[in-house]
């Protein structure tokens, strides 16, 4: 089983948005630098699809355009010597919840023990590469804010499908749009042009199945594990 609660994952985005915004900006800035370098040194999102994806993610958390531009300029600068390596860790949290951790690090010897410590501390188990990734699908995921309940579900669904989305679900204050990764930037732009406000927009690892944690100890440990991992400066994403 892959995750512990689908809508918990989405609703949690709202609660954490303000408290962790500064940390999110720092982590996204790191992703922008990597995207520019791995995109052949291009700072133009029209010619660098990975950069376009990261910019969509940045805008969803209200990262100011000046910050985005400044980070791109920094990545393009001849004096920029920052080198980050993408590393993925996989394991199981309390109750058998599958967890994937994406990191960008300049020192594997620092990051790996810290990630392992988080799993051990929270009654989890860091596993081998591939131990849980088979139970996730890589998808574009866009979460639309409907806190004021003013959006019409059918209208949003039609707009999303016309934009190229593959799936749509709604639950109270949020609506989730899914698409294939190759369609992500097109769908994001189409929905932005319609005036929708995003809570998050990212290429995500989506669990194929979800489980419910009923034990209070498991619930507390799972939340603690997520918090410990997300508070780590090297960790970019925690999928569960």
Say what each PLM segment does.
Residues 141-240:
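Positively charged, low-complexity, intrinsically disordered RNA-binding extensions
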Residues 1-127, 132-141, 240:
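N-terminal cationic and glycine-rich segments that engage phosphates or anionic surfaces
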